């Protein structure tokens, strides 16, 4: 029976079936996953649980999670005003760090774009920003919490470092894709560097810049919630930390999680639409 006559067959007689050979990186990744899975299995099998039953504890954790998701509410440790205020403080913190970061990143992004500055300056700025991006936001916040103390200052400064590094990369790559013909025409007409920037680059790339900035705002909100327990800046993340680690109230945890999730999903939907409209389909 000829295989080419089978329904859905897309090959004819004489064609070779293409096979994909595992490359070195894929083999290394598969081996790493296999080793980690084996170590995890060994650890679970040999761990000393004492008098705690693993499966019983797992069942209780599942029950707590179900309670948290199905019975959110307040238990007297916080008022609804406190929780909503913490949510708006988180949004304000994200907005502040995004605005300041965008201003700084705009200048550094211009200096990092190879079509607007020399290669040495661009290389140095991009290298420094790469190092800053490699350090997790939570670690930056912890560093500044030790350096300048707990509070909004440490949270803003820590979030700012990663925001600047992220936006410099996004802005500089957008600037480098500006129409070279327009830039060359402006330079040939005697335009200054700033005139080239504001007449040839910014008008073309302003939509992309705003889209990247809003995407970073969405990321900063999530980070602001996460760093609340570290910085103690009055954000909703700190209330979540208290509800989970100090008051041990599952219902309050559920309410706070739902509020954070609602805002995060809304921002994510808006960011995705902006990304598709101004960045992917540019």
Model regions and ranges:
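Generic hydrophobic transmembrane alpha-helix motif, especially the helices
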Residues: 129-163
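Alpha-helical membrane-interface segments at transmembrane helix boundaries
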Residues: 84-92, 125-132, 214, 218, ...
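Transmembrane-helix boundary motif in ABC transporter permease subunits
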Residues: 96-129
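Transmembrane alpha-helices and adjacent helix-loop boundaries
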Residues: 117-119, 134-140, 152, 208, ...
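Membrane-cytosol interface at the C-terminal ends of specific transmembrane alpha-helices
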Residues: 150-216, 223, 269-272
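C-terminal transmembrane helix and the adjacent membrane-cytosol boundary/short C-terminal tail
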Residues: 251-282
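A structural signal for multi-pass alpha-helical bundles of membrane permease subunits
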Residues: 41-52, 133, 141-149, 265
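N-terminal, non-cleaved signal-anchor transmembrane helix
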Residues: 1-99, 111, 279-282
């Amino acid at each position: 029976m000829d295989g080419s006559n089978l329904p859905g067959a897309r090959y004819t007689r004489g064609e070779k079936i293409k096979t994909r050979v595992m490359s070195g990186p894929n083999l290394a990744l598969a081996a790493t996953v296999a080793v980690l899975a084996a170590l995890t299995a060994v650890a679970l099998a040999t761990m000393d649980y004492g008098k705690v039953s693993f499966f019983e504890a797992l069942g209780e954790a599942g029950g707590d999670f179900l309670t948290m998701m199905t019975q959110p509410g307040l238990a007297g440790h916080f008022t609804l005003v406190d929780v909503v205020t913490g949510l708006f403080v988180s949004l304000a913190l994200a907005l502040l760090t995004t605005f300041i970061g965008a201003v700084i990143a705009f200048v550094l992004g211009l200096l990092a774009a190879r079509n607007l500055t020399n290669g040495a300056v661009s290389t140095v700025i991009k290298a420094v920003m790469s190092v800053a991006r490699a350090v997790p936001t939570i670690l930056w916040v912890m560093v500044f919490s030790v350096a300048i103390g707990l509070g909004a200052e440490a949270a803003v400064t820590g979030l700012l470092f990663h925001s600047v590094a992220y936006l410099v990369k996004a802005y500089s790559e957008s600037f480098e894709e500006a129409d070279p013909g327009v830039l060359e025409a402006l330079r040939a007409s005697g335009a200054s560097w700033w005139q080239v920037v504001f007449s040839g680059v910014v008008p073309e790339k302003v939509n992309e810049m705003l889209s990247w900035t809003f995407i970073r705002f969405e990321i900063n909100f999530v980070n602001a919630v996460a760093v609340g327990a570290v910085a103690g800046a009055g954000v909703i993340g700190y209330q979540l930390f208290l509800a989970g680690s100090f008051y041990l109230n599952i219902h309050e945890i559920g309410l706070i999680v739902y509020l954070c999730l609602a805002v995060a999903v809304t921002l994510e939907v808006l960011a995705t639409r902006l990304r598709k409209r101004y960045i992917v389909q540019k």
